[in-house]
A protein has these predicted regions:
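Conserved N-terminal beta1-alpha1 strand-loop-helix module at the mouth
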Residues: 1-71, 78-81, 118-139, 148-156, ...
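Catalytic cores of alpha/beta
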Residues: 71, 78-90, 126-137, 165-166, ...
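Aromatic/hydrophobic pocket-lining residues that form π-stacking "cages" and hydrophobic walls in ligand
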Residues: 64, 106-110, 163
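Hydrophobic, well-ordered secondary-structure scaffolds
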Residues: 70-101, 106-126
Length: 224
């Protein structure tokens, strides 16, 4: 995902059945239907596998594997056994939510995942967590506009935009990206976006994303 100097953005499209914020996916009951509809517009896919709050299941990833693009396992990963599961289910990347993990946990779990050949997306919402992870090598960093403790959207992406040059890691923006804010957000320095609800709700938004300049995908199943 080395696109900071390319003038283009990378996009990760997310499949989920529901969310703790109240979203319900009514357009794509079949994950493979969403994969087919959105494949040409994105660089990678994120699959919600967390069952309690998001109705996720690992079987949902099967329809995306044949698209030959990187797959991110989206869950509250806090144990190595969960990373083993991601590896065994042919995911390419895991998510670590730094707001809920200690510094030692992030280092330990990310190191374990990378030793298996997996990429690691470490997201944060609270600014002090960025200070913790910005110097860790070999990560993808994500700023989540949603406060996961309150589930409220508290986007401070303009402020976070000023921090991007403090790290050499790819830096993406997550949550609440839609047709109302994408043009403004696209002027910021983020390397890419993780987009879920907007692409599941609005099929026209897929084409809008492409028109804004998705980085060309080369077929290699890696974010780097």
């Amino acid at each position: 995902m080395q696109c900071r100097d390319s003038g283009k953005k990378a996009t990760i499209f997310e499949f989920k059945r529901s969310s703790a914020s109240g979203f319900k996916n009514i357009n794509y009951a079949d994950p493979e239907e969403f994969a087919n509809a959105s494949n040409e517009y994105c660089n990678a896919f994120s699959i919600l596998t967390e069952p309690l709050y998001f109705g996720g299941k690992f079987d949902d990833s099967k329809g995306f594997v044949r698209m030959n693009k990187p797959l991110l396992m989206k869950d509250f990963v806090d144990r190595k056994v969960m990373i083993d599961k991601a590896y065994s289910e042919n995911f390419d990347c895991i998510l670590l939510i730094s707001d809920f993990l200690s510094t030692d946990q992030v280092r330990d779990l990310s190191g374990y995942a990378k030793a298996l050949g997996l990429d690691v997306l470490v997201e944060f919402h609270e600014k002090d967590r960025f200070d913790m992870i910005k110097s860790m090598d070999g990560l993808i960093i994500g700023y989540n506009r949603r406060n996961l403790r309150t589930l409220k959207m508290e986007g401070e992406e303009e402020m976070i935009n000023n921090l991007i040059d403090e790290t050499d890691n790819p830096f993406i923006l997550e949550s609440g990206i839609n047709g109302e804010n994408i043009e403004r957000i696209n002027e910021l320095k983020f390397d890419g976006y993780l987009i879920g609800e907007a692409v599941l709700k609005d099929k026209e938004f897929l084409r809008e994303i492409k028109n804004l300049g998705v980085i060309g995908y080369d077929g290699s199943r890696s974010y780097n």
